Amino acid sequence: MIKVEKFSDEISKAEVLVEALPYIKKFAGSIAVIKFGGNAMKDPQIKSMVAEDIVLMKYVGLNPVIVHGGGPDINKMLASLNIETKFVNGLRVTDEKVMEIVEMVLVGKINKEITSLINKTGGKAVGLSGKDANLLLAEKDLSQGDLGYVGKVVNVNREVILNLIEKDYIPVIAPCAIGRDWKTYNVNADIAAGKIASSLNADKFVLLTDVEGVLKNKEDEESVISRLSYREAKDLLNSQFITGGMIPKLKCCIQALEDGVKRAHIIDGRIPHALLLEIYTDKGVGTMIAKEVYDNDNL
């Protein structure tokens, strides 16, 4: 008689792989746009795990497209140069000097760090700015008044991304955009990622954040709502139940669904291997939003 207990660790690992099988089959050849931000970018260990998740996704047939932020690094660089920065309703006032620093940090530092880390982990990542081949076309965002070189994405040159995917590369995109006036614009990374996802008709749009997901009870971090329909998400937003930084993230997910993305996810990037757990397990670890959701449906 074989003593199963002797192989309990190995069996549990095999069970995880078997659980992932229908998801691997479902998403083979699909596109997932992942906004890489929050604590996942600050903690070196978590950052490495995210890179591992991204590379594994690629190897099992899902095509990840990475869009990253970099607010804390930009703040740090501006402070070191004694350049004052102001915000209006979450948008950075961006004059020409600030824009120069934003581009330097996003494109020259963070983008290259993420690209190098993915390559070191075994992937084939290519770092891009939204200015490359007019990847992200922006116009001035005047929603909060004239804040300088703050833009909103009005067009995505999807062919650039699709050509890279076809050749098995992983695009890593910094959210600096080009305007019709040939000026550089600072664009919100979450919104840019959503625009990229919709332009690619992505199956998945994932926001890596510093919160567990959408909560039933704001005082209870364990009360994550694992699945929301599009209608439920809109109702929550309109009910003013959602507050703070979750409002723009939920709006971003809703807009992505309206623009053709099949599934949007808000997950806690502080959880080790959160991407794999959300996409390739039945339960997931965050909140999935879809036009329609069904019981036990994480596909």
Curated annotation (Swiss-Prot):
Superkingdom in the source lineage: Bacteria
Q: Which GO terms describe its cellular component?
A: cytoplasm
The record's section on HAMAP family has: ArgB
Known role: Catalyzes the ATP-dependent phosphorylation of N-acetyl-L-glutamate.
GO molecular function (one) = ATP binding
If you read the UniProt record, what top EC class would you report for this enzyme, in one word? transferase
Which residues are noted in the entry as substrate-binding?
A: 70-71, 92, 186
Q: Which SUPFAM superfamilies match?
A: Carbamate kinase-like
Q: Which is a GO BP term held by this UniProt record?
A: L-arginine biosynthetic process
Pathway membership of this protein?
Answer: Amino-acid biosynthesis; L-arginine biosynthesis; N(2)-acetyl-L-ornithine from L-glutamate: step 2/4
Report the leader peptide range: none
Q: Does the UniProt entry include the keyword Cytoplasm?
A: yes
Q: Where in the cell is it found?
A: Cytoplasm
Query: Which residues does this entry assign to the site Transition state stabilizer?
Result: 35, 249
Under the heading Pfam families, the entry gives: AA_kinase
Q: Could you identify this protein by its name?
A: Acetylglutamate kinase
- Keyword annotations of the record: Amino-acid biosynthesis, Arginine biosynthesis, ATP-binding, Cytoplasm, Kinase, Nucleotide-binding, Transferase
What this protein catalyses is:
N-acetyl-L-glutamate + ATP = N-acetyl-L-glutamyl 5-phosphate + ADP
Record-linked CDD domains: AAK_NAGK-C
Protein family according to the UniProt entry: Belongs to the acetylglutamate kinase family. ArgB subfamily.
Q: What is its EC number?
A: 2.7.2.8
